[in-house]
Swiss-Prot record:
InterPro entries: DASH_Dam1. Keywords: Cell cycle, Cell division, Centromere, Chromosome, Chromosome partition, Cytoplasm, Cytoskeleton, Kinetochore, Microtubule, Mitosis, Nucleus, Phosphoprotein. It comes from the Eukaryota. GO terms for biological process: attachment of mitotic spindle microtubules to kinetochore; attachment of spindle microtubules to kinetochore; cell division; homologous chromosome orientation in meiotic metaphase I; microtubule depolymerization; mitotic metaphase chromosome recapture; mitotic sister chromatid biorientation; mitotic spindle formation (spindle phase one). The modification Phosphoserine is found at S143. It is found in: Nucleus; Cytoplasm, Cytoskeleton, Spindle; Chromosome, Centromere, Kinetochore; Cytoplasm, Cytoskeleton. This is DASH complex subunit dam1. The lineage of its organism: Eukaryota, Fungi, Dikarya, Ascomycota, Taphrinomycotina. Pfam families: DASH_Dam1 (PF08653). The gene is dam1. It comes from Schizosaccharomyces pombe (strain 972 / ATCC 24843) (Fission yeast).
Length: 155
């Protein structure tokens, strides 16, 4: 609060308080404006400090913006350049539409619904009681198991 009061003081209010040694003596301009110039100097130095802080903040934000935009650009280029193995292809959508149509015709003919094979986070059940699942992306090419179990019909 004291800084605010100091900054809002009227710099000309103390001009009349300059001591005059004799009635006929005229104070010099420097003596009359000494306090006003001191207040002005304090305010200008405070303004300079704040502008320096503002400039430093702007530089920090510019550095962040440059780094963050580079990161976003890298993500965008990565999306164009990387071939995602598990991404659905246009044929996958066509196969799903055909599968849904086939299910609908079977349901109208038999009167009951055919459920999807159970999905437990990447492993598709090979239970023969379920309808054939779309195994377009169910490969074990990247598996750490060299010889996976073979499923037999006797299970």
């Amino acid at each position: 609060m004291e800084k605010y009061q100091k900054a809002t003081q009227n710099p000309l209010e103390n001009v009349d308080n300059v001591k005059i040694e004799s009635e006929n003596a005229i104070p010099s301009n420097l003596q009359a404006f000494t306090k006003s110039l001191a207040v002005l100097d304090d305010n200008v130095s405070e303004f300079r400090k704040r502008m320096n802080h503002l400039s430093a903040t702007k530089q920090i934000l510019d550095n962040f913006n440059e780094s963050f935009s580079s990161f976003l650009y890298g993500l965008q280029i990565n999306a164009f350049c990387v071939d995602y193995e598990n991404a659905p292809l246009s044929e996958s959508f066509l196969l799903q539409a055909k599968k849904d149509q086939f299910k609908a015709t079977l349901m109208t003919r038999t009167g009951h619904s055919i459920s999807d094979p159970p999905y437990d986070g990447g492993v598709i059940s090979h239970d023969p009681n379920f309808a054939t699942a779309d195994e377009t992306f169910a490969t074990n090419d990247t598996s750490f198991i060299e010889r996976p179990e073979t499923y037999s019909a006797s299970r």
